[in-house]
Amino acid sequence: MDLNGETSTKRKRSSVAAPAERPAKHLKPESSTLTPGDATPANGTVYDVEDEEDTGRVMPIGPAQADSPEWQATIEKVVKSVVSIHFCQTCSFDTDLSMSSQATGFVVDAERGYILTNRHVVCAGPFWGYCIFDNHEECDVRPVYRDPVHDFGILKFDPKAIRYMELTELKLRPEAARVGCEIRVVGNDAGEKLSILSGVISRLDRNAPEYGDGYCDFNTNYIQAAAAASGGSSGSPVVNIDGHAIALQAGGRADGAATDYFLPLDRPLRALECIRRGEPVARGTIQTQWILKPFDECRRLGLTPEWEAAVRKASPHETSMLVAEIILPEGPADGKLEEGDVLLQVNGELLTQFIRLDDILDSSVGKTVRLLVQRGGQNVEVECEVGDLHAITPDRFVTVAGGTFHNLSYQQARLYAIAARGVYVCEAAGSFKLENTLSGWIIDAVDKRPTRNLDEFTEVMKTIPDRARVVISYRHIRDLHTRGTSIVYIDRHWHPKMRMAIRNDETGLWDFSDLADPVPAETPVPRKADFIQLDGVSQPAVADIVRSFVRVSCTMPLKLDGYPQAKKTGFGLVIDAEKGLVVVSRAIVPYNLCDINITVADSIIVAAKVIFLHPLQNYTIIQYDPSLVQAPVQSAKLSTEYIKQGQETIFVGFNQNFRIVVAKTAVTDITTVSIPANASAPRYRAINLDAITVDTGLSGQCTNGVLIGEDGVVQALWLNYLGERTPSSHKDVEYHLGFATPALLPVTSKIQQGIIPKLRILNMESYVVQMSQARIMGVSEEWIQKVAQANPSRHQLFMVRKVDCPPPQFTDNADSLQEGDIILTLDGQLITRVSELDKMYEKEVLDALIVRNGQEMHLKLPTVPTEDLETDRAVVFCGAVLQKPHHAVRQQISKLHSEVYVSARSRGSPAYQYGLAPTNFITAVNGVPTPNLDSFVREVSKIPDNTYFRLRAVTFDNVPWVVTMKKNDHYFPMSEYVKDPSQPLGWRTVSHDRDRHKDGITPDAANLNPDAMDEVYEEVSDVEPEVD
């Protein structure tokens, strides 16, 4: 952590930032890439501002010249009031995703400890943060007010916490803002501790800028100037030469223009005065958006010359009037006002400015106002009841089944011109992860019952049992024309808590309470079904293979082992119908902390569990209860002979639409491969396997299937293999390859006998060398001849590419393999095929003959038990997922620095804010070594809440560093997932926050949502909404 407040995250050097899915704000590019902002993914779309705004007068100003003594004195005084704000929104809420960022604020009441900043900094949802003063003193801040519409909010700090400098405040002088006024913007520009930008006010009557799909201000004018502020300057004071704050920095352009937009301080000043007096900040609304339009446009809308003359006479300097832009359905003005109405009077008062309109509405909550408008040249007078703006601004949310919900906000309703009602999904995760989109859904009905608001939704969810499948009806707020219908699986076992969070403006926290215990799952009952028939397939044995396929859906409640997804679906092959055994790709079922459901004959859905995970060859064995399936499921016949290159076969696979396809083809190649390692974060990959490719285009379209002979015997599985993430597109590569069935038999035969294999493996990754290379590296002519005789089809040996980092109980010794060794024999058998390496599975020690540095050597090679390589425990601490280094980490690193490895982190968490990145190792807490998870949990349990502590960490590239972090038990209590075969789920969850969770069950908070977790490094950003 740099002293100036900028976060410098330590990570693997080659890692990349993974873009989120739906943009919410749009920020200025830095170094040719879009900078993520307060809720802004790196791939944010840029939106155009209305053309009218682009024609505004701009007075370009270059860098500040040598300031006059007056300006120097002013700046010296102002900087003592400016603070750098470091903050997080702990979970997605309303228009913003969970995030961590930096911004600016300034003290407006030194005695009471009030800081003025932007509303998009204070956040609509749960906030935690701190501020740093000019002398680098730090103190916590909490929100006391965020405006429902306008882009300002007020934070509170404890003035007594600042001991080494005299606190000063800036006076708010909104009336001092004038065209031509020279100004300075003093703030945390581009993440720097202090930047001073100069400019000149060019406009006072600009409409509020549109930032796209995220939070946008409206119903106010903005001030325009050329100051070239950027990310991090949000909330900066705009000061004049007298040292008074005359505006608030709010946003800027994303196209490189030096234009900035400032919020006038009239409404912030009023709110501050109310808070000082201990009064609520009343906010009124008739749910109508107004915009300023110049007189020429108003005339085209029907403004009569008489009224124009009256307005110009009353306000000689006015050039525009207020025109209705959006009237929300079901609002107070619905059916009374129309879009395009030109506002003339309110309560008999001629009115052309937003400020006066706000004054009237804010003082008339619960009352009626009279509006006179012109519509097509005709005077129309209407009466509207003024509603409470706070009442249609959500101040609570509910988390259930992994998702987060609240009432639709006025912000979202205004943006899409819809009624301000409905249940909004602000965190589409868990059971409610709909169409792979993070947020934006409106739930219309659940289980065939309407959910018009959050209360109705909550009552419906209380009655739905765990593991039930219910029909939901929904629309996305960006496409309200299309109504979707889906069946969702209600998860109340990994997410047992149904909780409500309510904003508490006294404490600045959101108070959580449990709403209802989960309804127990109903006992599954057997069901009947028939399989489809493959028409046009001449071989009956081939057509019958359809009875051996099942669809497999795997959902992970927590990101482990660097796996990038929270849900994956594919197909598995039934290898024993009587016992319910299915083999499936490990790219679909990566680890056993998961929910697995299989679908038989596209009709029967039953649960399954992990029986076996192969450490090297990319397959998982799962098991379901066959007594629940009354369908003619057939065990696939697996070939005991390896398929050969050039051999004809029949490809049967499933395309992207889950439709089965069949094609006659031939094997084009069988090559020994290892799936490329992922550079940004190690994760499971297949190594040391013979990959089969076939001569059909369907092979690239199908992720799962089989190669089958005309006799119906399965010769190979067709599997998907998770590969590397491409640096350019940030997408994960999947390989589709065949895997010969004889390689399965040593494992499947034991499992069918009721024995779970405990394999042992050599601690290495190898690759093929041809005889020309082997000869150069010292392999004798005698051995080259033996290779040719032993494997006529492929003359090859295996060279050690990488030796894995061994488990702690294994120490380096002279009988260990080294990179570059060529393996000749194991236990006296010449090794020229991958299948011949299988002898390592059951041997603790192998007698090996190798060639090293041109010399033949005999070694006693110890093998490693694979059960020690699978993850059996995870600790979630301050938003970071910690585990023992999994197998992929050991494959890619040469030394384990500790057994406390950061596998993932939640956005908006302390881990994210302070830069503790995935792939880091934690070696000590407050100077006490923590070599394993037990010692880590013991030490961090001693740390009080809201207290700083030190973590000593080491990056994947062996760079040691120290991170200071503040503990936050309110939003991020420590919890654990521990593998426990005695539990129904195979795991138990434990909360270490016993005071609030006496049942020991981890709360289902949005910060444990795997879709809000990053398993790779992603930069922490500065907040600055911008438009193009």
From Swiss-Prot:
Single GO biological process annotation from the record:
apoptotic process
Q: Which UniProt keywords apply?
A: Apoptosis, Hydrolase, Nucleus, Protease, Repeat, Serine protease
The UniProt record lists the keyword Nucleus: yes
Q: Where in the cell is it found?
A: Nucleus
- Can you tell which superkingdom this protein's organism belongs to? Eukaryota
Skewed-composition ranges (Acidic residues): 1012-1028
* Assigned EC number: 3.4.21.-
What is this protein's function per UniProt? Nuclear serine protease which mediates apoptosis.
Similarity section: Belongs to the peptidase S1C family.
Its name, as the record gives it, is Pro-apoptotic serine protease nma111
Q: Which organism is it from?
A: Neosartorya fischeri (strain ATCC 1020 / DSM 3700 / CBS 544.65 / FGSC A1164 / JCM 1740 / NRRL 181 / WB 181) (Aspergillus fischerianus)
Q: Which gene encodes it?
A: nma111
